[in-house]
Design a protein with these regions (language model features):
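Conserved N-terminal entry element of GNAT/NAT acetyltransferase domains
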Residues: 1-24
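Hydrophobic pocket/interface hotspot
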Residues: 26, 58
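Conserved GNAT-fold acetyl-CoA-binding loop/helix
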Residues: 31-57
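Conserved acyl-donor/pantetheine-binding loop and adjacent beta-alpha core of acyl/acetyltransferases
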Residues: 64, 71, 77-121, 131, ...
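Glycine-rich phosphate-binding loop
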Residues: 124
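C-terminal "cap" of GNAT-fold acetyltransferases
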Residues: 143, 147-152, 160, 166-187
């Protein structure tokens, strides 16, 4: 596990909101990111079982205008976002019902679906997206944030001051499970 270093004052890549037209590129990036960056923490079988139901594109984040993309020369090299809805994780099709809106006065916002191209890992992309998400969360009136972090993502969120609430396993198909860490922060 590498240590997290401070991000440069200005990131060399622009961040923008994701659009429906980005879905195909995101669908290519996510498995690439997960297979490379999660492999020190999860077995290949766990990774393959999690692609889609746990690790996948959630178009609701795009429709809500809460999902950000980092680009370099027009290529998506990272993505991540936040949600004002109940779900803590999962891609399209992982929920059987409408994902209800949260109340900023009572509920915690969710940080969701961070993925970075393996060739661009550990260069500050996740930190840049996280800082943008936290500002948007504050601007939307939320004062607390929940995350269900992968074991690989836990150091990034700890760097930002998120505290471990609990460790648990997400049940998946074929009697597989994925260990994760629920984390929380007051912003």
């Amino acid at each position: 596990m590498s240590s997290i270093s401070p991000m440069p004052r200005t990131a060399p890549w622009p961040l923008r909101l994701a659009h429906e037209a980005d879905v195909s590129a995101l669908e290519a990036l996510i498995p690439l990111s997960v297979r490379a960056l999660q492999s020190p923490y999860y077995s290949q079988a766990q990774i393959e079982a999690a692609l889609g139901p746990v690790f996948g594109v959630d178009r609701q984040l795009i429709r809500d205008g809460t999902y950000f993309i980092a680009e370099q020369d027009g290529v998506i090299i990272g993505c991540g976002g936040w949600s004002k809805r109940r779900a803590l994780y999962g891609g399209d099709g992982s929920r059987e019902h409408e994902d209800e809106l949260l109340d900023p006065q009572r509920d915690a916002a969710r940080v969701r679906a961070f993925f970075v191209h393996p060739d661009w890992a550990r260069r500050g992309i996740g930190r840049s997206i996280m800082a943008t998400c936290e500002q948007a969360i504050r601007d939307s009136g939320f004062r607390t944030v929940d995350i269900v972090a992968t074991l690989a993502g836990e150091p990034l969120y700890a760097f930002f001051g998120y505290a471990v609430v609990e460790r648990y396993d997400i049940a998946m198909a074929s009697d597989m499970s994925l260990p994760v860490v629920k984390m929380n922060k007051r912003i």
